Amino acid sequence: DGALALISAGKTDAKLFGMIKKDIKAKGPSYCTSKNVGGCAKVTITLLAAGEPTTYGGTDYAKPVTSLPDSALKERPFHQALDMIALERLGKPIPQKLFKSITDYVSARPGRNYPSTDGLMLAALSHVVSTAYGQEGITAVKAALVKRLDADRQTDGWGWPDHGANVRATTRVAPGLYRAGDANHKDQAVKGQAWLAGQQQVDGSFPSNVVSPAWTMMATVQAVPVLRGLQSLDTIGANPARAVTVDGWVPPRRLV
């Protein structure tokens, strides 16, 4: 997240990219595993945003995402949203089984709300196109997510109901609504961005709902892209998400 924050702020010098690659070389292989395909997707997104190949230090970080084992569908829904965004940045179609898993998640009623997951998933779905028949299904999934996020709106930010808005949820929700929402929800996203700016502390940091230095740092680096044009994991840096299909249907040129 720190690397993506710097890239979103226009820090694209060779020194930064050297630091990113050094960090990936040291930690990437243990982060990207068969049990954590979402981690592979996150590294893939970071490398693509930096304009770098997705194979580094002898490890092909994109391969677990493009091959997408069934075990990936048992990971958290947030990871599946990361898988979608990595595929979209690669210009690859979304596997039917991944889209079905996401549809099942949206159709179910989770025990609690997950605005961060729903917001990132909405951003990912905003790049998926299909035939007129299939598009109805995509539109319905997005509408269901928007409805859930309506319930999670707290003043001009987002968070769990009865807990108030929080920075990290708002950093995921605002870009998603801006990509996929109607005019009213786009306006909410812009207001959410303004709310986020108002949370900055005197020392420049942003507060987290968990009080610790590590969580404060995470909230801060996740806020930076949103403040700079409602950027998120799908749009930061080079190789932004492209319009893709489910299982490879080729859209008319006007939709690409």
Regions found by a protein language model. Name each.
Residues 1-14, 31-56, 71-96, 108-143, ...:
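An alpha-helical repeat/solenoid feature that recognizes helix-turn-helix modules
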